[in-house]
Design a protein with these regions (language model features):
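Short helix-terminating capping/connector loops at secondary-structure junctions
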Residues: 116-124, 169-175, 272-273
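Extended active-site neighborhood of metal-dependent phosphoesterases/phosphodiesterases
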Residues: 52-63, 144-177, 181, 185-232
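Divalent metal-coordination and catalytic microenvironments
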Residues: 76, 132, 161, 182, ...
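Conserved beta-sheet core of the metallophosphoesterase superfamily
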Residues: 169, 196-202, 206-224, 231-236, ...
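Structural motif
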Residues: 69-71, 124-126, 176, 233-235, ...
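A short acidic (Asp/Glu
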Residues: 83-84, 136-142, 179, 187-193, ...
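N-terminal active-site segment of His-dependent metallophosphoesterases
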Residues: 20-163
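BZIP DNA-binding basic region
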Residues: 1-19
Length: 344
């Protein structure tokens, strides 16, 4: 029976096991033979390869680190909307909460920069403001319940964003803000495709630009899709309301995939370079969706849940914003979630 002779009684716990082992059938005998061969092969391999160098090469510490850039996705503050905790199972939001959350975002971004700079320098921060920064008056209930009228809200929010950008300018070698218009601050009840930039978010961007006094750069494009370059990568910026969904704050997967493929096809048709990333807000949920030639990044909302999401979907998502880190060769190397849930 092969090497069964080597399995003497000392390896058995009692006589019953010994006799049982020596009365095994053919399948069990074959299993024992295979086990013996396997053990012998393992012993042989270890004895022959003991002391050989490891498969991995030693870690190489580069003396010179590569410059990186950061992109803060900032969207859907809906300033100065008021969310009543009495109606939303404790959710709360207003202009003061928004200000504290913006301050928290500022602190976290600078903290991440300080933590990473011992490993690699951060040469620039881009802030992609992806729309719906102002609550606007397109819905009658918002016009009635907003904490301030839209004109006053615009002035107050511009001051907050200027303070944030000025703080960033003290920490980063270069800071650039890009303002994209959302759907809530539009000037008409019905959405329009012509002159979509005719929007309170557009005015907000120019207001902040006037306050900047060239301490940081501000872009306020009229483009329906604005292309912003970061570390030799092309980022397409939109608000996202053009992607139709069955209900607000749902994720229309098919529509998003179609939009991502369509923009690449359009750029090729126009003889322009393709984009590497498509960034949008609007859906109030943070999402990174990798694609073949273009990754889709959806930002969360500073506001979080409200009466509408609770009443229509019995749902609320945490207020989260995205901070991206880019490498010149590898593109996005990190996505950090800035969770603002505890800031009330």
């Amino acid at each position: 029976v092969g090497k069964i002779k080597d399995r003497h009684a000392l390896t058995c716990r009692n006589c019953y096991e010994f006799s049982h082992k020596h009365q095994l059938g053919k399948p069990e005998k074959e299993r024992l033979r295979i086990e013996d061969r396997l053990l012998e092969d393992v012993r042989t391999y270890i004895s022959e390869n003991l002391g050989k160098p490891p498969v991995f090469k030693p870690v190489v510490h580069n003396a010179k680190a590569t410059d990186h850039e950061m992109v803060l996705c900032l969207s859907d503050t809906h300033y100065p909307e008021v969310v009543s905790p009495d109606e939303t199972m404790g959710l709360t939001y207003d202009a003061e909460v928004c200000a504290r959350r913006l301050e928290r975002i500022r602190d976290v971004v600078v903290r991440y920069k300080d933590l990473r700079e011992p490993a690699y320098p951060i040469r620039k921060l881009s802030v992609a403001l992806l729309g719906d920064m102002l609550s606007g008056n397109i819905h009658e209930e918002l016009e009635i319940t907003n904490q301030f009228p839209v004109s006053e809200a615009l002035v107050r929010l511009a001051q907050l964003l200027h303070t944030m950008a000025s703080s960033f300018a003290e920490e980063f070698p270069a800071v650039e803000l890009v303002f994209m218009p959302g759907n809530h601050p539009r000037l008409t009840k019905k959405p329009r495709h012509k002159a979509k930039w005719n929007n309170w978010d557009y005015v907000l961007g120019h207001f902040v630009s006037a306050l900047s006094r060239e301490t940081y750069t501000v872009q306020v494009p009229k483009d329906l899709v604005y292309v912003h370059e970061v570390c030799h990568r092309r980022l397409g910026l939109v608000h996202g309301d053009g992607v139709k969904s069955a209900s607000f704050a749902g994720i229309p997967w098919y529509g998003m995939r179609s939009r991502r493929e369509a923009i690449q096809s359009l750029l090729r048709h126009l003889g322009q370079p393709a984009i590497d990333y498509l960034l949008m807000g609007h859906f109030h949920q943070l999402l990174y969706w990798q694609g073949t030639d273009c990754d889709l990044i959806i930002n969360g909302a500073v506001k979080g849940g409200d009466e509408y999401s609770i009443d229509t979907r019995h749902a609320s998502t945490d207020p989260v914003q995205a901070l991206l880190t880019f490498h010149p060769k590898y593109g996005v190397t990190d996505l950090s979630r800035i969770n603002l849930k505890e800031v009330t």
